[in-house]
Amino acid sequence: EAYSEYTDCSGSNLVNMITHEHDRELMKLFDLEECYDKLPPLRNAADICGHVTKEASEKTGLPEGIPVAAGMFDINACGIASGLSDEEQMCMVAGTWSINEYISKEPVTNGTVALNSLFCMPGYYLIEESSPTSAGNMEWFIRNLMSYEKAEAKENGGSVYDITNEWVASIEPQDNNIIFLPFLNGSNEDPLAKGTFVGLTAYHNKKHMLRAVYEGIVFSHVTHVNKLLRNRERPKSVRLSGGAANSDVWVQIFADALQLPIDVIEDKELGAQGAAMAAGIAAGIYKDYQDAMRRTVKITKTIQPRPEYADIYKEKYAA
């Protein structure tokens, strides 16, 4: 038997956010009304929806008969694995996409945010802002402009990321006036937006350009966070995961630009961890999401903002 799941379907505009059920009027808006009666029943993320069959066991190596939970929307999984347990907290995922989110007992209905969806914890909505403007831009820079450094690092048993962090740390923000617009993969704001370096001169080198990439990605997150803050108070801190969280110098830029403490999450694959938390609840390993977060979510460090850098980044962001 097939099932659908609340967080995923609500994030796909297939669930009425008030009734929490599939909605014929929504389907009609998408010219999919004839599909309404074919939609599978909705289940919660930690509901058991079946068990591993013999055929599936033979193909995957998983033991036959173990329970299979519904799972959840990937941004829900990242949120719960970041420890979003109440309305005060906010988290960011700096991977290919710039994902920025918090949970609320009420949806945001004024059109100022990109997405409302049902959160995996009953009684909460996930309020989210995102765009494809995060650390994927740095991967493009490394692939196209740092092939020599990447090969050299590999030959010496190191990592190209050690080099990128060293380059960025060697330049103070006030000493670099290049602005990078991180739209290599497009933008939610303007379909014609493209990635751009602004302010390049003969004085600048790859180190200056890379510093601009780090900062431009942070500024994209700042844009999304500012939109979220139209509808809530500033949090006491922000939890960060994704590739950028592996770089202390990058995390410091986040803290300085936002002027908020940044809590770095220990785990690296938060989407998988969030799904595993739902499976653990389904299997009776965890009592509920609060128990799962208490037992699995770890903060490795907190990077404090430096007030003396606030105006520098504010001026750069305004540019």
Which residues fall in each region the model found?
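Gly/Ser/Thr-rich active-site cleft segment
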Residues: 1-72, 138, 181-182, 186, ...
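Glycine/Thr-rich phosphate-binding loops that ligate phosphate moieties of nucleotide
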Residues: 16, 43-49, 70, 102-319
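Short helix-loop-beta connector
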Residues: 62-63, 85-87, 232-236
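Short glycine-aspartate micro-motif
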Residues: 65-81, 89-93, 99-100, 180-181
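Hydrophobic residues within well-ordered alpha-helices
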Residues: 79-84, 275
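Glycine-rich loop at the start of a catalytic domain that most often binds anionic cofactors/ligands
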Residues: 83-87, 104-106
